[in-house]
Amino acid sequence: PGSTFKMVTAIAGLEEGIISGDTYVTCTGTYEYGGQTFRCNNHDTPMTLNVTDALKYSCNTFFYTVGQKLTGEHLEQWTKKFGLGTATGQAAGPTYREQQRKADPAIREWQGGDDLNAAIGQSDNGFTPLQLANYVSAIVNGGTLYKPTLVKSIKSYDYSSFMKTDESEVRGKIDISDATRELVMQGMSEVTDEGGTAGSVFADYPIKVGGKTGTAEMFENGESFDNGLFIAFAPFDNPQIVICVVGEGAGHGAYVAPIVRDMLDEYFSIGKSDSAASRQAENTLIRKNNCK
């Protein structure tokens, strides 16, 4: 997930009392730990940041600091609370590689440096786009984790009845303080403001959008590459929709943010005429004798 995971680290750090809104960390571009140098390449000059700043600029050093103090065990607990790495009931594909190191003796033991990488969404973190969208949805709605549904309802061909209706199922409630949620939401708001990692994409957008960019470091078949991710929700003050886009090999998440903007244009009928906006597609069954 890359840096789209940083909201989990922020929430865990705030709720566990490791940081507060008044905790500031100075980033010089590098972080020394255990004889290793961990880098932050997300801003050009040294900065002193709090948690909202760290989300806005996607500062690795801030989250390295939180990850070192938090430890992987506590971070994994919060990861599970948000449903990351657990089956959604709809998604196909890999889930969180729980206990992978213990199951495979060929994999080295977890090291302290892995806590740092996990805190910024690297290391063994591996989640589906649906899991990521669902976890951000739980943040913006106040802590309710839902089981995703693919189809809300299907109407009969003459609109007289519903042939199928799926009600949202609550998977769990996540206890997050209002203060923690407000700090994280503010950070996601500033991501799309001027100077934020997606600020240039949403600078003139008519609806306020919250979001988070991410760059997931991948290594497959002897080659390394970066996936770009962007998660967004809108409108900021009354969220209706959460979108997660992954661009394989796209690099930085800002490079896929325009795709999310296009999807929001479509959802909110931005830039369309009133007549076009009124023609909303519905899940309607078609009578067999209408098919040619």
Predicted features along the sequence, with ranges:
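Short, gly/Ser/Thr-rich active-site loops of penicillin-recognizing serine hydrolases
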Residues: 161, 165-171, 261-292
